[in-house]
Amino acid sequence: MKVKVSGEYTLAEIEVELDQQLTPDDLQPGATVLATNESTGGLERIVSHEELSRFFAVGPAGALPMPTDVVVERTLADPAFKQILQEADGKKGFDPQAEQMKIRDFLAGVTSSKMTTEQSVFHGSRSNSSASTVNRIKCPTCLVQFDAVAFQNHSCEAKPIEVAVPQQEKPHLVPTVSAPPAPLSKPASERVIRENQVRLRRYIKDEMKYDLATGIESSRKNAAKGPNECTMCDRKFVHASGLVRHMEKHALDLIPSQTSEQPHTIPAAGLHVVVKCNSCGRIFYDPQVAFRHGLIHDSEHSTMRQSPMTQVPSNRADFNELLLDGEMLIDNDPAFATSNQNTNPPKKEMFSSLILGSVLQCEFCEYIFADIAELLVHSASHVAERRFECTACDIQMNTAKEASIHFQTDCIFMREAIRSLNVTLSRYFVCNVCELKFANTDLLQEHRCTSFHYFPRLNENGKKLLLPCDFCDVNFEFAHDFLAHSEEKHLNKKKREKETRNTGAGRIRQYLCDICGKSYTQSSHLWQHLRFHQGVKPFVCQEENCDRKFTIRPDLNDHIRKCHTGERPYLCLVCGKRFLTGSVFYQHRLIHRGERRYECEECGKRFYRADALKNHQRIHTGEKPYSCLFCTKTFRQRGDRDKHIRARHSHLDANSRLMMQMQKFQLETAAAQKAQSHNPEQQDNDVAGGASTSDVPSGSGFMSTEPSVAEMQYSITPEQQEEMVCVPIDEVNNSFFMSHYMQAVPMEEDGSGQHIIVFEQPGQNMDMMSIYDQQQVGEPMHESGVPKRPAEENARVVVVKNNPTKPIFSDTYL
């Protein structure tokens, strides 16, 4: 190889044999190919592969690049690549001819190897070169190559090429590495970006997805994936269901961003110093990005100052946008630096520094702001007609919610693309408040009504917020009206249909209790229920001095918390109340949820609990099953009776309470006899059957006709109820009182084992107590001090002494 310096160029003349073919790999690093132009006779630099193929032979078959026509055809046939090209242009339509020319121009400047500052655009991987050639270093001053050891000991005394060449010829100097040549008029030379000083993004694998050297598709989707491995990322799952749930997160990732600007990386949470543009309000984490953004405002002001006649069309702006898309390196081009000097840098007054902990991001692009007013002004600049567009079917939508619904439910092409990934994407409906998923819209609307997840909307005038019903075209102003409408018109119907669906063969209660008729779905539940009938209590409390036993373990746990530990483990997160048992806590939660499951068939009123509905139904039936123990008043609820006893009878001692009970018994007996006298047919039937009311003492439990509670209540007059007061024993006729109630005590035929209750007056001696009998008043006392009736010798009288410290009745009524 001979090297000579001729005129204004440094040329490398390579001598080859006739049968030898020269490839581009035989060139040295940094070499520039010059060819003679036949028309002008001058030298011209070769920059494309097509022009280079006229002088050099094509490489071996294994290293053949993919033909340009094939790459262009595959690129235009792929919808994803079409979308990328369309976004890069920023135009609404798609021109295949123009895009084809752009792809060809781009491929003309891209090689199969990665472009760096040390390699030329035409220098590929030299597979036939030796290791010594690859590791050799060329001196930039004398252009002599050395190995690594010799280059360290090399001391160059030659003058640099820039000094050897005259100054007037310096712009025409052919550089080796540092100084790029003057730009040509061809678009391909501009896309090379001034001789490798800027490294573009690798379109070979990232965007074009084809390896130009081998023609093998290098998409990561075709890589070997496991049976439960995500095709979008490297996540692996044990079960297919986990993969399906994971792929739902990638659903919206298939829709490319509608903004051509690459999203910047926001730092982690915390306080950060940001730069704010005072012109538009945008904030930046990187000062360099803010500086480039300020040039846009300067160009806008300069454009407004220029007249339309003085504006010169140039492709330099498009070229700068291409630089922003790539990763820029250090630029040493003198011509480019001179052109940048004419552009005034943005003033410092255009920016201000802030310390922020949170930012506001536009929902339509990646811009971030610090002030809500500036964000609203920016959001209004987005055109509503083209905010979101489906890349598969070219349908345009206004909001992200519409785009998401279209992608998940309506777009057939997108579902086909997902199905090609062999992943089943479940169709679901999500609540925007709690992010719960539902299988259909009916369940979603039912959840919104019961959980108060309402979404008010403005009316046509834009002055009021209304609650629209999703099932019908009715709007409501208040939430309680909307809830009542949903429960009455829609939710009840849905629940009845759901109950009808749940009565299938799989939900039949086939385990029936022979004693009470209750049925269960599982045999274990029936076994636990039978313990109540059999009286089996296997669970014993282990606390000291406590031998309580229980049928089921939950009752034992409730007993321990209530009587020993006092623990209330069930906490309501809404109001903060705590509960002992889970059943009470569950009923309490229904209040916050607003779930009134139990409805009255008479009036339609709904309740949270079944016992509340049962108490309410007694209003319609008139039933009052809870009667006072000391008077004739009756109540519908047990709590009302207990309140009455604490208010009216808590001051009574043991004897007074017993007297009140006897007075109540007398009035009830009189009412029963009165009711029987008004029913002669029933009395005749009793006589015909061999039964007589005289055979059984009145008021006993052996009467054939027993009046109901309501009859006894109406038979006793209010005057009689007012007369039922506690009177001391000294103020009543003891002979009449004792004789009357001793006759009313039921006795067996032999009279054995029966007792007659008598009283000891407080402060009176036992020997001084007089006991009267109805038939024989003056019968003397026996020696034992216990009187006996003449016809019933074994009937004893039990003397009950008053002990105020131990009341007869439970303290619950006090």
Curated annotation (Swiss-Prot):
Expressed in testis; primary spermatocytes. Keywords: Developmental protein, Differentiation, DNA-binding, Meiosis, Metal-binding, Nucleus, Repeat, Spermatogenesis, Transcription, Transcription regulation, Zinc, Zinc-finger. Disulfide bonds: none annotated. A zinc finger (C2H2-type) spans 228-250, 275-297, 360-382, 429-453, 467-490, 511-533, 539-564, 570-592, 598-620, 626-649. Interacts with comr. It comes from Drosophila melanogaster (Fruit fly). This is Testis-specific zinc finger protein topi. The keyword Metal-binding applies. GO terms for molecular function: DNA-binding transcription factor activity; RNA polymerase II cis-regulatory region sequence-specific DNA binding; zinc ion binding.
